[in-house]
């Protein structure tokens, strides 16, 4: 399954607030469609599927990518759910979004893919790059690159920069000072349900 490129508010009406997908708020609180307002009892599978979809749409990853992240999270020590969230939070496109360089995760991914971002002084156009403590993420020294980032920093998607990221707005650069902690994940998600969803599939 490829990345979603359709109407974003349609997704947030169904799944709730997804700060990484869009900064717009849905006018209607019920799911789209003819029977959107009807209250139906959801199965346990449907609830787990919904949590999984939240994760996929918020971070803009494909189903295949998410399966890979689940496998990596399982192989690491500690809670699989927490490990999964940390892997997604440490993606370069998400870090650029959390810093305010991009208005959303898709917007930040475009910055990365178009070569506007450097990691440790080298242009890095791989959105899935895993940022680690000590990495310096900066906007490339080009007029067009700086203009894009400065415009986005005026109206960041999220108000607060996580404590593990040290942002220098004047230099349009930031340093990863520590590993991301669970409390700095901006998405309201029950990651255990995601792990349960994949328990028989992966």
Swiss-Prot record:
Pfam families the UniProt entry points to: Ribosomal_S4, S4
KW Ribosomal protein (keyword) present: yes
Gene Ontology CC terms: small ribosomal subunit
UniProt keyword rRNA-binding present: yes
PROSITE patterns, per database record: RIBOSOMAL_S4, S4
SUPFAM superfamilies for this protein: Alpha-L RNA-binding motif (SSF55174)
Any single biological process term in GO: translation
GO MF entries: rRNA binding; structural constituent of ribosome
Region listing for Disordered, in residue ranges: 15-42
Subunit field text: Part of the 30S ribosomal subunit. Contacts protein S5. The interaction surface between S4 and S5 is involved in control of translational fidelity.
Family of the protein in this entry: Belongs to the universal ribosomal protein uS4 family.
PANTHER family reported in the protein's UniProt record: 30S 40S RIBOSOMAL PROTEIN, SMALL RIBOSOMAL SUBUNIT PROTEIN US4M
Job of this protein: One of the primary rRNA binding proteins, it binds directly to 16S rRNA where it nucleates assembly of the body of the 30S subunit.
HAMAP family, per the entry: Ribosomal_uS4_B
Protein's name according to its UniProt entry: Small ribosomal subunit protein uS4
Source organism of this protein record: Synechococcus sp. (strain CC9605)
């Amino acid at each position: 399954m490829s990345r979603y490129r359709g109407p974003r508010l349609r997704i947030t009406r169904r799944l709730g607030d997804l700060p990484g997908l869009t900064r717009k708020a849905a006018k209607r609180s019920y799911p789209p469609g003819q029977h959107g307002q009807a209250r139906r009892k959801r199965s346990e599978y449907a609830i787990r599927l919904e949590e999984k979809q939240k994760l996929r749409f918020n971070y803009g990853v494909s189903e295949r990518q998410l399966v890979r992240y689940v496998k990596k999270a399982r192989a690491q020590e500690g809670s699989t759910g927490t490990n999964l969230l940390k892997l997604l939070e440490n993606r370069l496109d998400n870090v650029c979004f959390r810093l305010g360089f991009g208005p959303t995760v898709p917007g930040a991914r475009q910055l990365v893919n178009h070569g506007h971002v450097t990691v440790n002084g080298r242009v890095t156009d791989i959105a899935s790059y895993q940022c680690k403590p000590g990495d310096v993420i900066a906007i490339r020294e080009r007029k067009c690159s700086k203009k894009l980032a400065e415009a986005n920093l005026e109206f960041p998607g999220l108000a607060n920069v996580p404590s593990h990221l040290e942002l220098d707005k004047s230099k349009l650069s930031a340093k990863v000072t520590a590993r991301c902690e669970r409390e700095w994940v901006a998405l309201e998600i029950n990651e255990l349900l995601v792990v349960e969803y994949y328990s028989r599939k992966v």
